[in-house]
Amino acid sequence: MPFPVPDPFVWDTSFQVFYFKLDDQHRAIFETLFNSTNDNTPGNLQLFYIVTANHFEEEEGWMVSASYGGYDAHKKLHEEFLAKVRSFSAPVSKENLFYAKDWLVQHIKTIDFKYKQLL
C-alpha cells in the first residue's frame, strides 16, 4: 500500500534514514520541490533537479563504499527519476508535481529504508 504524500509537502521524521547527511539532503529535496510547487518557475525546477541529482550521486557513493547489494537497482531508479524530471518544463503540471512528490515519498519509505543500518 502506498504511503500518503504529505500536504503541505514537508519533510518530517517519518522519512529519517538515520544518516544525518542523507536526512538533511532529503529535507532539502522536499524543500526545493515544495518551493517549485508554490513558485512554479524554471529556476525552482532547475534547483530541484540539481539538489536531487547531487543527493543521488552522494547516496550512490555511500552505497558503493559500503558494497551495498541493492546498488545497481537503486541507481537505475535514480536515473529513471532524473530522466523524467528532465522532461518537465516550467510551469510544471500538477500531475508532474504530484508524480515527483509521490515518487520521492515511496522511494524514501520503501527503497531508501532498505539501506538503514547498512551504509
From Swiss-Prot:
<comment type="similarity">
    <text>Belongs to the hemerythrin family.</text>
</comment>
<feature type="binding site">
    <location>
        <position position="59"/>
    </location>
    <ligand>
        <name>Fe cation 2</name>
    </ligand>
</feature>
<dbReference type="Pfam" id="PF01814">
    <property type="entry name" value="Hemerythrin"/>
</dbReference>
<dbReference type="GO" id="GO:0005506">
    <property type="term" value="F:iron ion binding"/>
</dbReference>
<keyword id="KW-0479">Metal-binding</keyword>
<feature type="binding site">
    <location>
        <position position="55"/>
    </location>
    <ligand>
        <name>Fe cation 1</name>
    </ligand>
</feature>
<feature type="binding site">
    <location>
        <position position="78"/>
    </location>
    <ligand>
        <name>Fe cation 2</name>
    </ligand>
</feature>
<feature type="binding site">
    <location>
        <position position="112"/>
    </location>
    <ligand>
        <name>Fe cation 2</name>
    </ligand>
</feature>
<dbReference type="InterPro" id="IPR035938">
    <property type="entry name" value="Hemerythrin-like_sf"/>
</dbReference>
<feature type="binding site">
    <location>
        <position position="107"/>
    </location>
    <ligand>
        <name>Fe cation 2</name>
    </ligand>
</feature>
<dbReference type="InterPro" id="IPR012312">
    <property type="entry name" value="Hemerythrin-like"/>
</dbReference>
<keyword id="KW-0561">Oxygen transport</keyword>
<dbReference type="InterPro" id="IPR012827">
    <property type="entry name" value="Hemerythrin_metal-bd"/>
</dbReference>
<keyword id="KW-0813">Transport</keyword>
<dbReference type="InterPro" id="IPR002063">
    <property type="entry name" value="Haemerythrin"/>
</dbReference>
<comment type="function">
    <text>Hemerythrin is a respiratory protein in blood cells of certain marine worms. The oxygen-binding site in each chain contains two iron atoms.</text>
</comment>
<feature type="binding site">
    <location>
        <position position="59"/>
    </location>
    <ligand>
        <name>Fe cation 1</name>
    </ligand>
</feature>
<dbReference type="InterPro" id="IPR016131">
    <property type="entry name" value="Haemerythrin_Fe_BS"/>
</dbReference>
<feature type="binding site">
    <location>
        <position position="74"/>
    </location>
    <ligand>
        <name>Fe cation 2</name>
    </ligand>
</feature>
<feature type="binding site">
    <location>
        <position position="26"/>
    </location>
    <ligand>
        <name>Fe cation 1</name>
    </ligand>
</feature>
<keyword id="KW-0408">Iron</keyword>
<dbReference type="InterPro" id="IPR050669">
    <property type="entry name" value="Hemerythrin"/>
</dbReference>
<dbReference type="GO" id="GO:0005344">
    <property type="term" value="F:oxygen carrier activity"/>
</dbReference>
<feature type="binding site">
    <location>
        <position position="112"/>
    </location>
    <ligand>
        <name>Fe cation 1</name>
    </ligand>
</feature>
<protein>
    <recommendedName>
        <fullName>Hemerythrin subunit B</fullName>
    </recommendedName>
</protein>
